[in-house]
Amino acid sequence: FGGTGWSLGWKVCLWARLGDGENALRLIENQLRPINPKALIRVRGGGSYPNLLDAHPPFQIDGNFGVTAGIAEMLIGGALPKCWSGKVTGLVTPDDTISYAFKNGKRVK
């Protein structure tokens, strides 16, 4: 579940498309892990700088874009992790506009 930049975004999208929100979430958490930009050594890949840019020196914007695309894929395809509750309103796909509420990873509306 490691990786940096575009590879994390790509993996989030793949797990979301496979309907596995739990594994997609693990990668999102890796992407959002705070990184000290001045640290000389990092044990694991991934993470975000304090400005939320992807930590792949200097940075890879496609990592940020890929992870957000993966989150949209999770919401569109219903690959919701059990710990997620909330609602999505007006998420546009080529064929539809999606709005629903969800609790503990399950749609309620």
List where the protein language model places each region.
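Long, repeat-rich segments with strong aromatic
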Residues: 1-23
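Non-catalytic C-terminal accessory modules of carbohydrate-active enzymes
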Residues: 22-109
